[in-house]
Amino acid sequence: MRPLIIAHRGASHLAPENTLTAFRLAKTLGADGFECDVQITRDRHLVVAHDYLTDLKTGVHGNIPDMDFDDLRQLDFGKWKSPEFAGEKIPTLEEVLKSHRTSG
């Protein structure tokens, strides 16, 4: 019996953590599953992000529970990792689950 490989926040060593790109890459690399962090926005959307504060990952000050989803979706959650990930948006929990389910 082999151990299960669970990708922490997706393939976060190669792509911005908790993004659709990171979760897809984890699957491509053979991870058996992943873990993610979920926050709730002011207008009750479930989004996937580790930190409540947006500062570190976007360079824009904000607190996810105090923000509306549409405002969060305008922020870039990828360029902090590398310019190649610029434009990466915060995913909803539903998007992450659908992406994982339909990717194989």
Regions found by a protein language model. Give the residues of each.
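Phosphate-group recognition and catalysis centered on beta-loop-alpha active-site segments
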Residues: 1-104
